[in-house]
């Protein structure tokens, strides 16, 4: 299977007079492909969260069992992000990403026909493992086509894909329920999003690009020599493209203190984010006494409110903080803590929704 994901041969060289136009077009296509692809991963991930009230009602699962299912998927996803991203270094980004989407879709079809708890557990673990195939190709594609001075804004644009994807899950599933009815809740919750994900996987294959060299263009360093970064390496060390995934990890990740700082911060960011996403439906329905329609609106606001703030954060980190990402992250984490207290203590529908949106923003 891994051999099918390997990078293909380089395309014929683009004529010199067409290089600039082709480069501009290809890099926009490459960015659009990973935007749409990563968006689709969230369609076949967050749909599980929206199905949790029905897991309680229709399959009689307890809150503890639902929490265990969510934890299994997220732990598998966390492990997979590291492993799959390493494998993606040696694969075709577009094929790797599309393959992961199709596998997630297949797992969701399985969820649409399952009723036993342990079958659900096995399938959500598989879904978590395949979900990890989305982030690596995205980072690789952005690094291949965009110089460092643009990556704050480009990364911010790409990052809103998961908010768009998470935000459109509720309308997709809601429309499926309207058409199929609540008696077909599994089809509406799992099979319909799976079909949508397959359509997006096809778009990734059509739009996606390899590195500039693989597309017959000069490398990024040749196109933008002012952005060329000379890596200081130890004597005799091999170039990254000739190193194994394990060697790259040991050299550029394990010994990189900045990578550890970012990982440490990310632990707490994801703790809040996935804690909110995983429990928001049940919490709002059972504790805050929202209706299912009101809960869906709050879920949508949590995701979509992050879109403008993410773009603003990318611009601020590039312009105001001169490329330093950590100060803004610390400010946002402090504000998140304050807003979580408001989310917890508020009783009115409006204020709970507002604090939900602000946490999503940050």
Positions of PLM-derived features:
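C-terminal transmembrane helical hairpin of 12-TM major facilitator-type secondary transporters
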Residues: 323-362
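Cytoplasmic helix-loop-helix junction between adjacent transmembrane helices
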Residues: 123-162
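Helix-loop-helix hairpin linking two adjacent transmembrane segments in secondary transporters
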Residues: 158-212
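Cytoplasmic membrane-interface "Motif A"-like loop-to-helix N-cap segments
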Residues: 90-101, 319-333
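Conserved MFS/SLC helix-loop-helix module at the cytosolic interface between two early adjacent transmembrane helices
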Residues: 79-117
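Helix-to-loop junctions at the C-terminal end of transmembrane segments
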Residues: 81-92, 310-323
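Extracytoplasmic gate region of multi-pass secondary transporters
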Residues: 48-52, 252-311
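Helix-breaking motifs and short loop linkers at transmembrane-helix boundaries and internal kinks
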Residues: 60, 92, 113-118, 289, ...
């Amino acid at each position: 299977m891994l051999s099918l994901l390997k990078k293909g041969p380089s395309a014929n060289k683009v004529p010199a007079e067409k290089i600039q136009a082709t480069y501009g077009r290809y890099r926009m296509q490459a960015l659009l492909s990973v935007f749409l692809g990563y968006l689709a991963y969230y369609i076949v991930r967050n749909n599980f969260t929206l199905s949790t009230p029905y897991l309680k009602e229709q399959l009689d699962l307890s809150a503890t069992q639902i929490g265990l299912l969510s934890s299994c998927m997220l732990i598998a996803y966390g492990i997979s992000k590291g492993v799959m991203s390493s494998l993606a270094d040696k694969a075709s980004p577009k094929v790797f990403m599309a393959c992961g989407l199709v596998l997630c879709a297949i797992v969701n079809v399985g969820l649409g026909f399952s009723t036993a708890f342990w079958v659900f557990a096995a399938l959500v673990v598989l879904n978590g493992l395949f979900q990890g195939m989305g982030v690596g190709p995205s980072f690789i594609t952005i690094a291949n086509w965009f110089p460092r001075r643009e990556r704050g804004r480009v990364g911010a644009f790409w990052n809103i894909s998961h908010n768009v994807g998470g935000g459109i899950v509720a309308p997709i599933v809601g429309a499926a329920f309207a058409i199929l009815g609540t008696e077909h809740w599994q089809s509406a919750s799992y099979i319909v999003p799976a079909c949508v994900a397959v359509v997006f996987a096809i778009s990734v294959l059509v739009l996606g690009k390899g590195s500039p060299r693989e597309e017959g263009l000069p490398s990024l360093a040749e196109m933008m020599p002012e952005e060329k970064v000379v890596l200081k390496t130890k004597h005799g060390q091999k170039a990254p493209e000739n190193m194994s995934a394990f060697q790259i990890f040991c050299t550029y990740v394990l010994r990189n203190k900045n990578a550890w700082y970012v990982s440490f911060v990310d632990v707490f960011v994801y703790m809040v984010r996935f804690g909110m996403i995983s429990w928001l439906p049940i919490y709002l329905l059972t504790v805050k006494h929202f209706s299912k329609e009101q809960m869906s609106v709050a879920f949508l606001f949590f995701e979509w409110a992050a879109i403008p703030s993410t773009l603003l954060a990318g611009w601020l980190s590039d312009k105001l903080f001169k490329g330093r990402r950590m100060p803004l992250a610390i400010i946002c984490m402090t504000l998140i803590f304050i807003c979580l207290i408001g989310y917890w203590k508020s009783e009115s529908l409006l204020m709970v929704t507002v604090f939900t949106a602000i946490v999503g923003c940050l």
